[in-house]
Amino acid sequence: MTPEIRAFEFALGLFAVLIGLAIADIATSFHRLLRSPARVHWDPIALLAAAFAIVITVGMWFDLWGIRQATSVRHFFLYLVLVALFFVLFLIAASSLPDETSDGVDLRDFYRRNHRYFWSLVTLFEISYVALGIHFLGSVVDRIPRVQIALVAGQWAVLIAAPVVLALARSRRIHYAGVTLLFAVVFWHYANAVIN
């Protein structure tokens, strides 16, 4: 077993906790909505935003596996950056659905009031994600076909630009289109991801 793998296994514990907390927060909020004694007015965009938070959280779990042999995983500052990134991921999850349901909830109104905060966090996450991607690909970029680099750069551009637009836009059509685009890009990115 290499030193990188041992370091990765050591670091994985805290990452697993942060990922688990993020998913548990969404599950708890969704459970409260389902069991609320007061009326809940459902909204597809709010639910799609929560689903997107789950997808990028699970995606990060797969990405962790991809960096398990990177030498820089053993460095304190990279670990700190990764913890900060997972903290932002938790904030995304925690802000995706309301916590209080006792007085009734209108998810459309919740999303309208919350979308700027939620998508700003997603933007921060994606900028950090791209920066880490550049860090990890930097040493092998000369061995990657130019077409693949262009595809990755395009994907990264969408992952940063779309949440910026969603944070600023009020139009529900733009939100449906933006969320659909984000799902398409993320699913395309992870389509061949395997933990083995």
Regions inferred by a protein language model and the residue ranges of each:
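Hydrophobic transmembrane alpha-helical segments in integral membrane proteins
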Residues: 1-22
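Alpha-helical transmembrane segments of polytopic membrane proteins
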Residues: 12-16, 74-87, 146-159
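Membrane-interface helix-boundary motifs at transmembrane edges
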Residues: 32-45, 69-73, 102-112, 166-177
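A generic, lipid-embedded transmembrane alpha helix
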Residues: 42-67
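Central hydrophobic cores of alpha-helical transmembrane segments
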Residues: 48, 175-187
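Membrane-proximal helix-loop-helix units in multi-pass membrane proteins
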Residues: 83-153
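Juxtamembrane boundary at the C-terminal end of a transmembrane helix
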Residues: 138, 187-196
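Hydrophobic, membrane-inserted alpha-helices
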Residues: 156-165, 183-185
